[in-house]
Amino acid sequence: MSLLATLGLELDRALLPASGLGWLVDYGKLPPAPAPLAPYEVLGGALEGGLPVGGEPLAGDGFSDWMTERVDFTALLPLEPPLPPGTLPQPSPTPPDLEAMASLLKKELEQMEDFFLDAPPLPPPSPPPLPPPPLPPAPSLPLSLPSFDLPQPPVLDTLDLLAIYCRNEAGQEEVGMPPLPPPQQPPPPSPPQPSRLAPYPHPATTRGDRKQKKRDQNKSAALRYRQRKRAEGEALEGECQGLEARNRELKERAESVEREIQYVKDLLIEVYKARSQRTRSC
């Protein structure tokens, strides 16, 4: 057996399990290969009708009876006895390394599963914050600027100016005559008050309004309290009157029942006396 065949057999036995080596060919029991022949010798024997390699004569030509040749396949069959039908080969034992790796992998999977099961659930995502409500539009108030009337100078006619000028000239010519006083100008009119109220009330008025509003609220609360108490008193009084009437009715019934019981007692006493007299007379 050649070295390559031996190495191939050892490699197959190392890679495959022991139960699966039955189909391998035992290279040690194969018949040895015949010695190589020269090509001319094989061809010449075939052409001349001579003997083939085994030395046996052929019935016909050298290429027609090879299908009828019997071959012994016992050397190629496995040495182990064949398994009965319906039975499966026993599984090969797994190596300890694979078992250790499988157990480690199983432990790791169990640890990961426990970790994911013990982990606290994630909180639900918080809803996005609502957008702020739109601000109401500011009321557009027509801002009217207060109008101020400028004082107009008094209108003097040209005749008045000429008269004043002539008087001044005449007064300067006459000695001892005091000059005329200048014409009195009317006082400037006071600026008109703005017709529109200020946008913000005065703080003093706001304080007074708050006090008045609180006073009104206290009055209304006291009035509601008195009304509620009056209604409760009326309800209690009506209930008391109803209970008193019921009490009187029950008392009258009890008195009537008591009179009936006394009447029955008197009847029983009379009956007993009558029977006793009859028994005595008999």
UniProtKB/Swiss-Prot annotation:
Domain annotation bZIP: ranges: 208-271
Region called Required for protein stabilization induced by IL1B, residue ranges: 1-21
Function field: Transcription factor that either stimulates or represses gene transcription through binding of different DNA regulatory elements such as cAMP response element (CRE) (consensus: 5'-GTGACGT[AC][AG]-3'), ATF5-specific response element (ARE) (consensus: 5'-C[CT]TCT[CT]CCTT[AT]-3') but also the amino acid response element (AARE), present in many viral and cellular promoters. Critically involved, often in a cell type-dependent manner, in cell survival, proliferation, and differentiation. Its transcriptional activity is enhanced by CCND3 and slightly inhibited by CDK4.
PANTHER family from the UniProt entry: ACTIVATING TRANSCRIPTION FACTOR ATF 4/5 (PTHR13044), CYCLIC AMP-DEPENDENT TRANSCRIPTION FACTOR ATF-5 (PTHR13044:SF3)
InterPro entries: bZIP (IPR004827), bZIP_sf (IPR046347)
GO biological process: cerebellar granule cell precursor proliferation; circadian rhythm; fat cell differentiation; multicellular organism growth; negative regulation of apoptotic process; negative regulation of cell cycle G2/M phase transition; negative regulation of cell population proliferation; negative regulation of DNA-templated transcription
Modifications made to the protein after synthesis: Ubiquitinated by CDC34 and UBE2B in order to be degraded by the proteasome. Cisplatin inhibits ubiquitination and proteasome-mediated degradation by inhibiting the interaction with CDC34. Ubiquitination and degradation by the proteasome are inhibited by NLK in a kinase-independent manner.
Positions of region (Interaction with PTP4A1): 119-217
Protein name: Cyclic AMP-dependent transcription factor ATF-5
Keywords for the protein's UniProt record, in alphabetical order: Acetylation, Activator, Cytoplasm, Cytoskeleton, DNA-binding, Nucleus, Phosphoprotein, Transcription, Transcription regulation, Ubl conjugation
Subunit field text: Binds DNA as a dimer. Interacts with PTP4A1/PRL-1. Interacts with CCND3, but not with CCND1 or CCND2. Interacts with HSPA1A or HSPA1B; the interaction protects ATF5 from degradation via proteasome-dependent and caspase-dependent processes. Interacts (via C-terminal region) with NPM1 (via C-terminal region); the interaction leads to loss of association between HSPA1A or HSPA1B and ATF5 and promotes ATF5 degradation via proteasome-dependent and caspase-dependent processes. Interacts with NLK; the interaction stabilizes ATF5 at the protein level in a kinase-independent manner.
Organism: Homo sapiens (Human)
Subcellular location: Cytoplasm; Nucleus; Cytoplasm, Cytoskeleton, Microtubule organizing center, Centrosome
A Pfam family it matches: bZIP_1
Family listed: Belongs to the bZIP family.
Record's GO cellular component terms: centrosome; chromatin; cytosol; nucleoplasm; nucleus; RNA polymerase II transcription regulator complex
Start and end residues of each stretch annotated as Basic motif: 210-230
Region described as Leucine-zipper: spans on this chain: 236-250
Gene3D superfamilies per the UniProt record, alphabetical: 1.20.5.170
GO molecular function: chromatin binding; DNA-binding transcription activator activity, RNA polymerase II-specific; DNA-binding transcription factor activity; DNA-binding transcription factor activity, RNA polymerase II-specific; kinase binding; RNA polymerase II transcription regulatory region sequence-specific DNA binding; sequence-specific DNA binding; transcription cis-regulatory region binding
Post-translational modification Phosphoserine, affected residues: S256
Bias kind Pro residues: ranges: 120-140, 178-194
Organism ancestry: Eukaryota, Metazoa, Chordata, Craniata, Vertebrata
